[in-house]
Amino acid sequence: MKKFIFATIFALASCAAQPAMAGYDKDLCEWSMTADQTEVETQIEADIMNIVKRDRPEMKAEVQKQLKSGGVMQYNYVLYCDKNFNNKNIIAEVVGE
């Protein structure tokens, strides 16, 4: 049942029209620090790809390549816990611009 609830949350979050723009979401921050790492990585990747799709679709292949090379968890803090990070900057963060 717990996995079903998380799957539903991920599905809804992945389909959201706009990902969060602020780098701080108290609930997501707390969840991402305690949840299963695989689930967190899946959510981080979905959120990053939603930002790419909305802001810089031409970067989709490059961002996917970088995310697949590993280290998805390194974006956890800036996406969900950093009050000073604007999530629009995540693409530059991922591809090293």
UniProtKB/Swiss-Prot annotation:
Any one of the GO BP annotations: superinfection exclusion
Compartments (UniProt record): Host periplasm
Residues annotated as signal peptide: 1-22
GO CC annotations on file: host cell periplasmic space
InterPro entries per UniProt: SPACKLE_T4 (IPR046391)
Record key words, sorted: Disulfide bond, Host periplasm, Host-virus interaction, Signal, Superinfection exclusion
Main location class: host cell
Superkingdom per UniProt: Viruses
Description of how the protein assembles with itself and partners: Monomer. Interacts with the baseplate central spike protein Gp5; this interaction selectively inhibits the lysozyme activity of the baseplate central spike protein.
Function of the protein: Inhibits viral DNA ejection into the host cytoplasm, thereby conferring the infected host bacteria with immunity against secondary phage infection. Achieves superinfection exclusion by localizing to the periplasm and inhibiting the activity of tail-associated lysozyme, thereby preventing penetration by the tail tube of incoming phages.
Protein family per UniProt: Belongs to the Tevenvirinae spackle protein family.
Name of the protein this chain belongs to: Protein spackle
UniProt source species: Enterobacteria phage T4 (Bacteriophage T4)
